[in-house]
Amino acid sequence: FRRQKLEQYEASCKRSNQDYIFFISTLWSHENCVASTNVFRSEYMLYCHNHPKILFEGGFLIKDKNRQGEVYERLRLKGHIPISAYIDNTKKSLIVFNTPSCWDCHGWKLGEFLAMGKAIISTPITNELPYPLIHRQNIYIINSKEELYKAVDLLIEDHALRISLEENAKAYYREYVAPEKVIESIANKLRDI
């Protein structure tokens, strides 16, 4: 994946007319990913894939040397998805899923999802952020696979909550994550030294 210009993430996109969910991610071999990240991501994909109301597209990007490749083979992404299609399909996706990966970092996805103004279901955020993300305000936090399933069902049915999460995620991005806001925050911290 070669990341695209920020404008592509920030630009609005027409939503799908159906309950379409798109999600691709890397299958990681790092220890915390084997125990948590890969498990949550696979549960999300399988639940969405098997859900009668959802048209799911996606899967894992699995490197041949990944020791867990066989375990998740049924979720292997078939073919290549260009970054432009990844962005467009993520924007069309009714909801998105975030979980920290290697060393519990946020990775690209959290920032991408905020920039796109998506309704985000996420496992707990353990790292410091410029301002906390708040459950049911700008993110939907889950702690178990049962909570994950309930969150998916809730957000495909509760349009008002989903739209509120989308709008507040975009507002959070504009206030705290947009490049000019990050630079401003760094400059303010340097002045305080």
Please state what every model-predicted region is.
Residues 69-78, 83-193:
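Catalytic binding pocket for nucleotide-activated donors in carbohydrate/polymer assembly enzymes
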Residues 1-107, 124-131:
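Nucleotide-sugar donor-binding catalytic core of glycosyltransferases
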